[in-house]
């Protein structure tokens, strides 16, 4: 039987994965549960893992997959933290739980418009030279969609690795905690977690090696919101 804190954390992780496709950061978990330190989150995660509700994925910093949910949260897990679509050239290799295969029947071709920095600045997005197939159900919400190749490791704790392809829905607005494509001062594009703090906008990395960058709101334009991720094995 889970304690209230364990249940609250499991529900928070599940809702964030369902909404964003990626788990919350440890800081976000700490804030959501009103805990004073990350050590409390570590203890709760360990307890959930020991009870078989979650598992931490190897070689992915702090990446969490929900294995099951208690009946109070809807029973069986409806998808944990795994890439929403997997492509690869090893047909006999097992796919992670919850991964979706792309078939020609339901695939949609999106423009791969360039590279996005999950680390140091690289370039703004403006190179439409290729396309990538994604499942149609990934394209939710209003607005056009496009794909970007990730360069850098600043978002690894959110499960976004160097070389991944992210699927972005075009939008100019974002809620706190969204992972967005942000254009800084009209020339630098970056993939970061969006946090508005008064009249300032903080672009937070998901890697402790990178500092949070804070700008006045006139310096940052939201170009899109993360809705999916493609990883090649």
Swiss-Prot record:
List the active-site residues.
154 (for autocatalytic cleavage activity), 192 (for autocatalytic cleavage activity)
Q: Where is this site: Cleavage?
A: 118-119
DNA-binding region(s) in UniProt? 26-46
Enzyme Commission no: 3.4.21.88
Disulfide connectivity for this sequence is none
Name its GO BP terms in alphabetical order. DNA repair; DNA replication; negative regulation of DNA-templated transcription; proteolysis; SOS response
The reaction(s) annotated as catalysed by this protein in its Swiss-Prot or TrEMBL entry are: Hydrolysis of Ala-|-Gly bond in repressor LexA
This protein's superkingdom? Answer: Bacteria
What is the uppermost EC class here?
A: hydrolase
**CDD domains xref list:** S24_LexA-like
InterPro entries given in the database record: LexA (IPR006200), LexA-like (IPR039418), LexA/Signal_pep-like_sf (IPR036286), LexA_DNA-bd_dom (IPR006199), LexA_repressor (IPR050077), Peptidase_S24_LexA (IPR006197), Peptidase_S24_S26A/B/C (IPR015927), WH-like_DNA-bd_sf (IPR036388)
A Pfam short name: LexA_DNA_bind
Q: Which UniProt keywords apply?
A: Autocatalytic cleavage, DNA damage, DNA repair, DNA replication, DNA-binding, Hydrolase, Repressor, SOS response, Transcription, Transcription regulation
| An MF annotation (GO) of this entry | serine-type endopeptidase activity
For this chain, the family text in UniProt reads:
Belongs to the peptidase S24 family.
What the protein does comes down to:
Represses a number of genes involved in the response to DNA damage (SOS response), including recA and lexA. In the presence of single-stranded DNA, RecA interacts with LexA causing an autocatalytic cleavage which disrupts the DNA-binding part of LexA, leading to derepression of the SOS regulon and eventually DNA repair.
Binding partners and assembly: Homodimer.
**PANTHER family annotated for this entry?**
LEXA REPRESSOR (PTHR33516), LEXA REPRESSOR-RELATED (PTHR33516:SF2)
By what name is this protein known? LexA repressor
Species source reads Roseobacter denitrificans (strain ATCC 33942 / OCh 114)
């Amino acid at each position: 039987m889970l304690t209230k804190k364990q249940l609250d954390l499991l529900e928070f992780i599940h809702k964030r994965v369902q909404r964003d496709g990626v788990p919350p950061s440890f800081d976000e978990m700490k804030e959501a549960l009103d805990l004073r330190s990350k050590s409390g989150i570590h203890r709760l995660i360990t307890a959930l893992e020991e009870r078989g509700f979650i598992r931490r994925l190897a070689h992915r910093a702090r990446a969490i997959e929900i294995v099951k949910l208690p009946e109070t949260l809807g029973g069986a897990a409806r998808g944990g933290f795994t890439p929403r679509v997997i492509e690869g050239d090893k047909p006999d290799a097992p796919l992670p739980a919850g991964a979706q295969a792309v078939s020609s029947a339901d695939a949609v071709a999106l423009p791969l418009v360039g590279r996005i920095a999950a680390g140091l600045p690289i370039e703004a997005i403006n190179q439409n030279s290729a396309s990538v197939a994604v499942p149609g159900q990934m394209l939710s919400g209003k607005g056009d969609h496009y794909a970007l190749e990730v360069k850098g490791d600043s978002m690894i704790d959110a499960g976004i690795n160097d070389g991944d392809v992210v699927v972005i829905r075009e939008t100019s607005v974002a809620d706190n905690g969204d992972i967005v494509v942000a254009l800084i001062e009209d020339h630098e594009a970056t993939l970061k977690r969006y946090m508005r703090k008064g009249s300032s906008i903080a672009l937070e990395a998901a890697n402790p090696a990178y500092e949070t960058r804070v700008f006045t709101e006139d310096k940052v334009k939201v170009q899109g919101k993360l809705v999916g991720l493609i990883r090649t094995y």
